[in-house]
Design a protein with these regions (language model features):
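Conserved acidic catalytic loop of the alpha/beta-hydrolase fold
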Residues: 64-82
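Conserved alpha/beta-hydrolase "nucleophile elbow" surrounding the catalytic nucleophile
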Residues: 16, 82, 86-88
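Short glycine-enriched nucleophile-adjacent loop
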Residues: 91-102, 108
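The conserved SAM/SAH-binding core of class I Rossmann-like methyltransferase domains
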Residues: 41-43, 87, 111
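Structural signature of beta-strand start/N-cap positions in the alpha/beta core
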Residues: 11, 39, 80-83, 104-107
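Flexible "cap/lid" loop of the alpha/beta hydrolase fold
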Residues: 106-142
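Conserved HGGG/HGGXW glycine-rich cap/lid loop of the alpha/beta-hydrolase fold
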Residues: 2-53, 59
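Active-site micro-motifs of SAM-dependent methyltransferase domains
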Residues: 20, 91, 115-116
């Protein structure tokens, strides 16, 4: 983990998406949030950056455990609760934390995140071309 700002300020935990290290939250962004009165914490979730890593396809953990790790970060900094800002998978994890540990979450900010609720029936469907594009990622070699 890495922190920016004064620990006495409002804490915000930055949760990045899948296969992305905490440094994808730029230092300048973190510093600006800190200058605005936030205590900023970013961390590498499992299999990213400086955290524990496993052989591709051999990860012995679940998405729920990744969400529990967010609470471990909150605990590790001695905080009662924190604002959560999640990008992509990080947003999904932030939602799980809010559902499982509502008293530990001051607010949620989600960027490009999947939803945990049922879809709104009035929303238009995804264009099939978008689905096809993202399905091609299944065949990519992500090991490098």
């Amino acid at each position: 983990t890495e922190s920016f700002g004064d620990p006495a300020h409002e804490p915000i935990i930055l949760i990045m998406g899948a296969m992305s290290s905490a440094v994808w939250w730029p230092d300048e962004f973190c510093s600006q949030l800190a200058k605005m009165g936030r205590y900023v914490i970013r961390y590498d979730h499992r299999d990213t950056g400086k955290s524990t890593s496993y052989e591709p396809g051999q990860a012995p953990y679940s998405v729920e455990e990744l969400a529990d790790d967010v609470v471990r970060v909150i605990d590790g900094y001695g905080l009662e609760a924190a604002h959560l800002l999640g990008m992509s998978l990080g947003g999904f994890l932030a939602q799980l934390v809010a559902l499982k540990y509502p008293k530990r979450v001051k607010s949620l900010t989600l960027i490009a995140s999947e939803r945990l609720a049922d879809a709104d029936p009035d929303m238009p469907a995804f264009d099939p071309a978008i689905i096809e594009y993202h399905q091609r990622a299944e065949s990519l070699d992500w090991s490098d």
